[in-house]
């Protein structure tokens, strides 16, 4: 019997009058502090039960109720549990009414609804039970279920019959036989609401309002109802016999997520198909720094548990936290195809793929500025407005909705082109530094402006106004202000100022440069590791269509870097989706002229092999027969979204969507008048008579497919036939369209050995190069002449005009003149063929020949055959662009000859009007468009064509059955004129074209016909403009596509066989198999082909989505929370590929226990060392971006084993095949192999079956392409700067050879090695600095009867921090210390000065290398004071008694309190513990054995308080005689010649007087211990140069090493291993290496650096927070700072740079400054930069961080273990006391370099980061204002200038004598030796 219920009512639900949650009377659920619901008999829940076994009234009442709802009773008994025939209570109570008991649920109390229990009658696989909830103590999932004893290793022995479960149920409640591990599901019972009309519903009906939509429970969002996916599935745990048989208990979080209500019935179903309950994909959201090893461990800890959408999971006691976003299961349809479907819950298995998305990533938003940015979209909104009013607000709103905390950087980037005359203008004014040339020889500059830099905000909407303002100003800043600032600086005249430059088009943009600039700082993402964020997201917002013309080498380099980092890029295009595949990168590459023939074996049939042209370098290949070709790449690392939102037009499926636009035509205004109809040219029709019948849908589809075939099947047919196209007649040889980029590259090859004409000089700064396209014009044509005439000067750009060029509609007269000019030019050409030879390269005729493509011609017809009216031809000046769909054209106008070159790549846009320049438009529109408006524009009505003469030998158009346009994205064609080699009598044809208007006088209009020749073609009239050639062959088969690279142009122009050696052929064949390149039709890709292409390069990201989408909708999940690289992949080369493409090697790792094994926990090593080592080796590789290779997801039951690429010897070749469960499955078995891959590396880790070792087989891909770095230069505007600055960067290939020494790493794991140096390890630097705040008052801050000053508290705080770190030192398994404690050697010197203190350096060496300790054989109790003193004075006893400098005083024979306390502990066996040692030390002080050197303190075990032996015991320290003086000053000349130093003046003001002071009096004596020779020059010689005076001053004490001697090396740091998880919350060893300073000055920064390999970063963050909180108590601040100096920031990140702050008034030159500093005991004693240091430390609260390298003595080499060898600090670096800023002191008028401490500014905070950003800006503004005010600087220099020394003042010796006399008077009588303790 359960105890009487005493329910504690919880908060009642809104829908019920009273609570139904009962707390504290039932059985205690596992892991809960709160008892579960009481075991209340439902039938008797309103009554008290007695022992009378009669039928109860409740039984009768409920029996009638059960009959009314037709609920079946239990009629059978189970073999496991006896069941009763009554429902629902045992048949034995006598009932006493209890009105306080809860009511029995009745038919009318079920929320007013009706229970639909019909489904319960169908079978015995379900049952209805009452649901109760309880509150678990912890989330009982994974490692967090039992944090005190986490699972060290996955084990198959973990009781499969009793899995952990959050659901509590009595087995007797289920009407079928059950056992632990069975799969069940909890579902809501459908309750239909009665449809009773009420007044409110009637009112709603009358008003026409829709009823409010009911919000679904969190776990059921985005899950389709009615599909059986909304239940909670779980594995049955252990039986709970104490639970009521009519109840089921679940955690309250589960009930909330699924909408289960307490004490309402739910359906419990049995699941027969267990596979249907397993989750295939689970997506997690997290918001912290989460390593990949932690992701893997979290996934393994969840195996076997149930997760539901919205559930929060944790690892390592809550150190790792994540939330489930969705759960996917593959659901098979009727046709047997598995499709991913969303479910509300699922059970995690080893095969479950985990997807992790970071809500705290570093996000880069690149916004492209180009010509299209300022254009209008179809909806009338400019693209720039779409960014600031559309995309960014929606993105920021979604960020806020998801609760992200990204660190965001927003950058505008642009490329500006310059004409020749503008380059001359820039050259004239010496502004060509950052000019570069593209492939066509066109000059450009790259601009990058940082609008937002590394900011973290709670409300990003507030940043939109500033972003908009910066966007609006960008035009003026780039096109005018940048050069204007340079001109004004040079004093240029007003009339010389011009607006220069032109925006590039979107596809010409520097997008790859932008991506690489973002990747540069990420190359060392493990340095300065931010412990609050994970991942890098790069988003490029562009007004283009996702197509970019790029450089091949830069594309290859970017691809390698993206794959190496395991990253992807998001392109957000603001246009409509184009009619071709995106993203699309076009480039020019060499290629073999024919597919390489490869033979698989002797006599085998030759197979064509095409190398990946992106990785094909002609100069490294043995193929000699090569050519240049246009190539296209679909990068797998780019995800494209199209944000084409029309805000004022809701989406409609039937709305016409424009996919191709001609911006110039739209801006003419003609289309605004609905007075005519635009006539679109007709499709080309074959001569073959077609049946006169209506075309069906299938007919149309067949025609379209045949058309596609004619475009994309050329190369496949060649490969299939295996014959050379050169064997056929020239007329049948199909030519390839050639882009302007291709023409330019060919021109470069032809002119590479020729000297280019340089009319104005010899170098780039004063000469103009000949454009490669001009060389093409002069050398690439046969019939046209080479001579050119000078081009007429182009009109100058308007000066200082910021108005955009006006766009006016062409008048009818102007339109008519176009046709007049066309006809006249053609007539002249017919009469004077030599006119072409004398035409200039930029003339319309030459441009048409070299630039404008001629569209495919129709089949030959006799003139007059066509009933159609002719159409005007294309203008010669317009560059007609062919889009990937040959039926689309766009027109580019308003271009010079070089601007036409940029149109080589396809874009669906036309040329916009000029911006920021009023210049006459030189472009015109297609003739077929003008022809449509002729009835409106012209009085004459010509109905014939106006052809122009062109020497065209195009054989790819209208010449027969072999006519196939080649390019999937054809570009501007090359119209090469070649003489016919075909038939003897070439037949004339007509080529439609229209010349551009001439600037000369226009003659009257006369129609004319020009005849030209074309081999094997004939035409007597002009046909409608053709759009495509007729189909020629079938589509290639899939097998044929496999043999062709998708980067290969699909045309066989000039193809020929190339014979290579067998090894090269084999390598090429393996390459294409491994890389898996496929030919696709980018204008009509099939789903299968797209998947294959993505598999070819994107296998690393295969499991980031359940199914790759083919729709380019906005990928909001990726933009909101970027995905991390998946943990698994399914790519693995076969044996043949591994032999040909990879270098391999093998090594073994022994599995033996080692003493130095700190990366493996001792308990795990003792349990199963090999398993623990294997797990750690996998974890470390996952941390380095490796992925576990598993079987393909769809291959769950492979029919035969997948062939493996590596075979070991027979006795070890066991279990090397892949498993679908990956590493987790192998670790559970404890045998087999784990395969991992990363970029170009593949590793296999194998348990050796017979030996205690792990065999590692590695494979590294061979590099067969060039890996030269790319040098970039441009202009950047960093945040906080004023204007654009010059910048440069290097883009380097990843080091594929062996980026990480994994052999060293594996032997580090097994304890054979302990050095991190050869590895890529994570590191971050912290400093401890004074905060400038008062210490926090708390009990125990001040010792009793002690008065500590502010400096004492700073020392005490540093000591407390070190004591905390000592508690984290790694200990032995038995708990004993394994390492010496961290200690501090206190000093008041600066770092560059303390190295000259010989006694201090000896103390430093003892601390680093260790010292001797006592034998603990003596007892202190009963020993006399003399005996104790004698022990203290013995050498090498652990107590260091030496001369110490402190606050400009020298204390002879002293020791500090910490050393004495430690000596007592180590020497006497009866002194146990710190407290006991402190008591004994205090007793020694009280009895007169020791005293404080200044008698101002009792005994305190602090590092900075010094004590000495009192008289007469001090004489026992024999080598320190009293005659040397008790307090000898640096300035003393006798035993009593010392004085107290005046207050100091710098940040090191508490630093002691410099050693140089002694050097002034006796230089040889000051450096005698250093064995240095001094050069004697009086430092007070009086030179005027303060810097030179300082050097002479330093030379006095900076002795140069002897001839051939070595510098003295001093180690300044101590290194320890920290155990970050002393409470064992994690299931692995969590260790880090700590580097800490030893010598410390409390007024300077104390340095720590942490190094680690793949630890749980949350534990590091916990340690940081603990140290930070402790530091603040004592007036200190624990600050994270960059590892390297801020002056080196631009070397890693070109768009970040320290901000220079110059001094308006240089510091004065004081000849005797060094003498004055000596007189006032200046701490550093260095006159150099004295005034600059004073500005920082005295005026603005900065603290010295690191001193410049050149300030250290020349004869000393200082070594810091956390700095790389050779790393130098150019300038001294300071940190502000708030930690928000870092400053380096340059000196002189150059002043300082300022940089915000991004690690602090961007760190999360409760108040919001905006405050920190504003604080840092305010600090910088204050310093800038002060440094720019010469008057304030002058006053400040006078204030800090030390007064000159005078002889009238009292000497230091006199003051010291008085002080010592007073000391002698206060001395107590010496204690007697018989005094005992």
From Swiss-Prot:
Q: Where does the record place the DEP domain? A: 1435-1511
Instruction: Give yes or no: UniProt keyword Membrane.
Output: yes
Instruction: Provide the protein's localization.
Output: Vacuole membrane
- Cite the record's Low complexity compositional bias ranges: 797-812, 865-888, 988-1003
Q: Which GO terms describe its molecular function?
A: GTPase activator activity
Q: Where is the composition biased (Polar residues)?
A: 764-779, 813-841, 1011-1023
GO biological process terms held by the UniProt record = intracellular signal transduction; negative regulation of TORC1 signaling; positive regulation of autophagy
Q: Which PROSITE patterns match?
A: DEP (PS50186)
Q: Cellular component per GO? A: GATOR1 complex; vacuolar membrane
Region (Disordered): which ranges? 1-38, 195-214, 746-925, 956-1043, 1528-1548, 1566-1585, 1838-1877
Per UniProt, what is the membrane topology? Peripheral membrane protein
The similarity comment for this entry is: Belongs to the IML1 family.
Instruction: Tell me the protein's name.
Output: Vacuolar membrane-associated protein IML1
Gene symbol? IML1
């Amino acid at each position: 019997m359960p105890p009487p219920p005493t329910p504690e009512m919880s908060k009642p639900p809104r829908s019920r009058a009273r609570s139904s949650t009962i707390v504290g009377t039932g059985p205690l659920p596992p892991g809960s502090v709160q008892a579960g619901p009481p075991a209340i008999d439902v039938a008797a829940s309103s009554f008290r039960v007695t022992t009378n076994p009669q039928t109860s009234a409740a039984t009768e009442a409920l029996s009638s109720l059960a009959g009314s709802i037709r609920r079946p009773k239990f009629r059978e008994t189970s073999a496991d549990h006896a069941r009763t025939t009554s429902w629902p209570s045992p048949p034995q109570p006598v009932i006493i009414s209890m009105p306080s008991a809860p009511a029995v649920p009745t038919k009318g109390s079920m929320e007013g609804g009706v229970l639909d229990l019909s489904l319960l009658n169908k079978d015995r696989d379900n049952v209805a039970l009452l649901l109760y909830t309880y509150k678990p103590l912890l989330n009982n999932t994974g490692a967090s279920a039992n944090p005190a004893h986490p699972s060290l290793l996955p084990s198959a022995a973990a009781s499969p019959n009793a899995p952990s479960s959050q659901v509590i149920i009595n087995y007797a409640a289920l009407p079928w036989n059950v056992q632990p591990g069975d799969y069940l599901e909890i579902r809501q019972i459908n309750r239909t609401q009665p449809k009773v009309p009420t007044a409110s519903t009637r009112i709603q009906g009358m008003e026409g309002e829709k009823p409010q939509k009911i919000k679904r429970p969190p776990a059921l969002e985005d899950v389709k109802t009615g599909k059986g996916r909304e239940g909670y599935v779980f594995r049955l745990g252990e039986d709970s016999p104490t639970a009521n048989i009519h109840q089921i208990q679940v955690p309250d979080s589960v009930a909330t997520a699924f909408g289960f209500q307490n004490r309402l019935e739910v359906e419990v179903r049995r699941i027969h198909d267990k596979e249907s309950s397993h989750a295939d994909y689970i997506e997690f959201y997290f918001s912290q720094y989460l390593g990949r090893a932690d992701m893997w461990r979290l996934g393994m800890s969840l195996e076997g548990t149930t997760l539901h959408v919205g559930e929060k999971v944790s690892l390592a006691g809550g150190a790792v936290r994540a939330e489930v976003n969705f759960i996917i299961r593959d659901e098979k349809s009727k046709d047997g195809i598995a499709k991913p479907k969303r479910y509300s819950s699922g059970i995690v298995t080893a095969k479950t793929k985990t997807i992790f998305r970071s809500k705290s990533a570093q996000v880069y938003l690149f916004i492209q500025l180009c010509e299209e940015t300022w254009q209008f979209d179809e909806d009338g909104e400019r693209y720039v407005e779409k960014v600031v009013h559309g995309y960014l607000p929606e993105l920021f709103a979604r960020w806020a909705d998801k609760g992200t905390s990204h660190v965001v950087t927003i950058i505008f980037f642009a490329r500006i082109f310059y004409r020749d005359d503008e380059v001359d203008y820039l050259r004239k004014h010496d502004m060509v530094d950052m000019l570069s040339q593209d492939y066509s020889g066109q000059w450009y500059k790259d601009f990058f402006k940082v609008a937002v830099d590394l900011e973290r905000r709670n409300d990003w909407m507030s940043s939109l106004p500033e972003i908009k303002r910066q966007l609006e100003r960008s035009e003026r800043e780039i096109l005018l202000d940048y050069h204007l600032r340079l001109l004004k600086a040079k004093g240029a005249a007003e009339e010389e100022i011009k607006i220069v430059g032109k925006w590039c088009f979107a596809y010409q943009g520097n997008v790859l440069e932008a991506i690489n600039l973002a990747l540069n700082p990420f190359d060392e993402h493990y340095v300065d590791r931010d412990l609050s964020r994970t991942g890098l997201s790069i988003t490029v917002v562009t007004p283009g269509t996702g197509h970019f013309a790029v450089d091949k080498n830069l594309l290859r380099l970017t691809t390698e870097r993206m794959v190496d980092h395991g990253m992807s890029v998001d392109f957000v295009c603001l246009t409509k989706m184009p009619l071709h595949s995106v993203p699309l990168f076009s480039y020019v590459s060499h290629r073999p002229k024919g597919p390489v023939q490869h033979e698989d074996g002797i006599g085998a049939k030759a197979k064509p092999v095409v190398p990946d042209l992106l990785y094909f370098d002609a100069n490294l290949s043995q193929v000699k027969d090569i050519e240049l070709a246009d190539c296209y790449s679909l990068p797998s690392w780019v995800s494209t979204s199209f944000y084409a939102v029309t805000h004022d037009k809701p989406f409609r499926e039937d709305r016409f969507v424009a996919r191709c636009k001609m911006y110039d035509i739209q801006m003419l205004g003609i289309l605004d008048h609905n007075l005519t109809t635009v006539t679109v040219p007709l499709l080309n029709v074959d001569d073959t008579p077609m049946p006169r019948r209506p075309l069906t849908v299938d007919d149309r589809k067949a025609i379209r497919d045949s058309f596609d075939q004619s475009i994309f099947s050329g190369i496949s047919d060649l490969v299939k036939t295996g014959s050379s196209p050169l064997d056929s007649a020239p007329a049948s040889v199909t030519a390839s369209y050639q882009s302007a980029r291709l023409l330019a590259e060919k021109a470069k090859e032809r002119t590479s050995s020729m000297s280019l004409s340089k009319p104005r000089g010899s170098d780039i700064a004063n000469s103009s190069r000949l454009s490669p396209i001009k060389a093409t014009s002069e050398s690439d044509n046969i019939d046209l002449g080479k001579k050119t005439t000078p081009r007429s000067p182009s009109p100058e750009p308007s000066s200082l005009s910021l108005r955009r060029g006006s766009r006016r509609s062409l008048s009818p007269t102007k339109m008519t003149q176009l046709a007049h000019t066309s006809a006249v030019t053609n007539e002249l050409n017919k009469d004077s063929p030599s006119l072409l030879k004398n035409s200039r390269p930029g003339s319309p005729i030459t441009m048409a020949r070299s630039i404008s493509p001629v569209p495919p011609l129709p089949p030959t017809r006799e003139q007059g055959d066509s009933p159609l009216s002719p159409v005007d031809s294309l203008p010669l000046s317009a560059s007609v662009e062919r889009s990937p769909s040959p039926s689309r054209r766009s027109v580019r106008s308003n271009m010079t000859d070089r601007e036409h070159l940029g149109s080589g790549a396809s874009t669906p846009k036309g040329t916009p009007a000029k911006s920021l320049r009023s210049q006459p438009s030189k472009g015109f529109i297609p003739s077929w468009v003008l022809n449509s408006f002729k009835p409106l524009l012209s009085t004459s009505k010509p109905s014939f064509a106006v052809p122009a003469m062109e020497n065209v030998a195009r054989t790819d158009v209208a010449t027969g059955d072999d006519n196939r346009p080649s390019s999937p994205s054809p570009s501007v064609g090359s119209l090469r004129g070649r003489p016919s080699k075909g038939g003897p009598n070439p037949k004339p044809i007509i080529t439609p074209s229209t010349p551009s208007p001439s600037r000369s006088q226009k003659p009257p209009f006369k129609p004319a016909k020009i005849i030209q020749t074309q081999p094997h073609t004939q035409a007597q009239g002009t046909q409608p403009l053709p759009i495509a050639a007729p189909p020629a062959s079938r589509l290639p088969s899939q097998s044929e596509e496999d043999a062709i690279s998708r980067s290969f142009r699909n045309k066989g122009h000039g193809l020929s066989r190339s014979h290579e050696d067998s090894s090269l052929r084999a390598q090429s064949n393996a390459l294409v198999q491994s890389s898996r390149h496929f030919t696709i039709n980018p204008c009509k890709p099939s789903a299968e082909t797209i998947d294959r292409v993505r598999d070819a390069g994107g296998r690393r990201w295969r499991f980031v989505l359940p199914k790759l989408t083919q729709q380019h909708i906005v990928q909001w999940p990726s933009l909101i929370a970027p995905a991390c690289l998946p943990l698994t992949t399914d790519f693995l080369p076969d044996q043949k590929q591994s032999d040909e493409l990879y270098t391999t090697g093998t090594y073994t790792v022994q599995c033996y226990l080692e003493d130095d094994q700190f990366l493996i926990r001792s308990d795990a090593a003792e349990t199963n060392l090999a398993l623990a080592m294997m797990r750690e080796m996998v974890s470390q590789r996952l941390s380095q971006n490796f992925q576990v290779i598993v079987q393909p997801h769809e291959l769950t039951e492979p029919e035969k084993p997948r062939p493996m690429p590596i075979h070991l010897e027979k006795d070890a070749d066991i279990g090397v095949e892949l498993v679908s469960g990956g590493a987790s499955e192998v670790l559970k078995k404890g045998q087999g192999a784990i395969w991992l891959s990363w970029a170009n590396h593949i590793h296999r880790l194998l348990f050796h079956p017979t030996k205690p070792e792990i065999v590692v087989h590695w494979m590294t891909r061979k590099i067969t392409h060039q890996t030269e770095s790319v040098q970039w230069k441009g202009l950047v505007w960093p945040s906080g700067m004023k204007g654009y600055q010059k910048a440069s960067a290097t883009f380097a290939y990843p080091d594929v050879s062996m980026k990480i020494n994994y052999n060293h790493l594996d032997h580090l794991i097994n304890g054979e090695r302990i050095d991190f140096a050869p590895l890529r390890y994570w590191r971050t630097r912290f400093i401890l600095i004074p905060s400038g705040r008062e210490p926090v008052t708390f009990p125990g801050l001040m010792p009793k009867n002690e008065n500590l000053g502010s400096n004492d508290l700073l020392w005490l705080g540093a000591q407390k921090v070190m004591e905390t770190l000592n508690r984290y030192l790694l200990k032995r398994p038995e708990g004993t210390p394994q390492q010496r404690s961290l200690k501090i050697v206190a000093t008041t010197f600066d770092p560059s000065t303390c190295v000259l203190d010989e006694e201090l350096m000896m103390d430093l060496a003892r601390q680093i290398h260790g010292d001797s300790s006592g034998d603990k054989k003596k007892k202190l109790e009963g020993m006399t004071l003399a005996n104790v003193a004698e022990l203290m004075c013995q050498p090498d006893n652990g107590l260091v008694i030496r001369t110490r400098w402190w606050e400009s005083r020298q204390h002879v024979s002293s020791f500090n309190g910490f050393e004495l306390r430690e000596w007592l502990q180590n020497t006497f066996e009866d002194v146990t513990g710190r407290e006991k040692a402190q008591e004994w030390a205090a007793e020694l002080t009280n009895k007169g054995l020791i005293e404080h050197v200044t008698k101002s303190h009792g005994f305190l075990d602090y590092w900075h308080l010094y004590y000495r032996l009192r008289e007469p015991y001090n004489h026992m320290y024999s080598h320190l005689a009293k005659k040397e003086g008790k307090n000898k000053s640096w300035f003393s000349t006798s035993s009593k010649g010392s004085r107290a130093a005046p207050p100091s003046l710098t940040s090191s003001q508490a630093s002691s007087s410099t050693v140089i002071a002694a050097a002034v009096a006796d230089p040889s004596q000051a450096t005698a211990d250093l064995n240095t020779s001094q050069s004697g020059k009086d430092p007070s010689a009086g030179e005027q140069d303060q810097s030179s005076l300082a050097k002479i001053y330093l030379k006095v004490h900076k002795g140069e090493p002897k001839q051939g001697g070595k510098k003295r090396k001093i180690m300044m740091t101590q290194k320890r291993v920290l155990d970050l998880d002393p409470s064992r919350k994690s299931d692995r060893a969590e260790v880090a290496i700590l580097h800490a300073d030893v010598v410390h000055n409390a007024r300077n920064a104390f340095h720590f650096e942490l190094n680690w390999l793949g630890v749980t970063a949350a534990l590091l963050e916990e340690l940081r927070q603990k140290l930070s909180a402790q530091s603040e108590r004592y007036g200190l601040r624990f600050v994270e700072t960059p590892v390297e100096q801020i002056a080196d920031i631009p070397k890693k990140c070109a768009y970040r740079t320290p901000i220079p702050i110059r001094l308006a008034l240089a510091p004065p030159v004081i000849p005797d400054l060094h003498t004055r500093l000596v007189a006032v005991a200046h701490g550093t004693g260095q006159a150099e930069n004295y005034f600059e240091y004073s500005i920082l430390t005295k005026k603005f609260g900065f603290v010295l961080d690191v001193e410049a390298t050149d300030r250290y003595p020349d004869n000393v080499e200082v070594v810091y273990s956390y700095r790389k060898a050779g790393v130098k600090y150019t300038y001294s670096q300071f940190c502000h006391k708030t930690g928000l800023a870092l400053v380096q002191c340059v000196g002189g008028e150059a002043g300082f370099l300022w940089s915000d401490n991004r690690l602090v500014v961007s760190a999360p905070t409760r108040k919001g980061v905006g405050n920190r950003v504003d604080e840092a800006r305010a600090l910088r503004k204050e310093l800038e204002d002060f440094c720019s005010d010469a008057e304030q600087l002058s006053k400040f220099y006078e204030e800090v200038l030390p007064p000159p020394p005078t002889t009238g003042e009292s000497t230091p010796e006199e003051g010291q004598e008085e002080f010592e006399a007073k000391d002698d008077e206060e001395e107590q009588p010496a204690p007697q030796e018989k005094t005992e303790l």
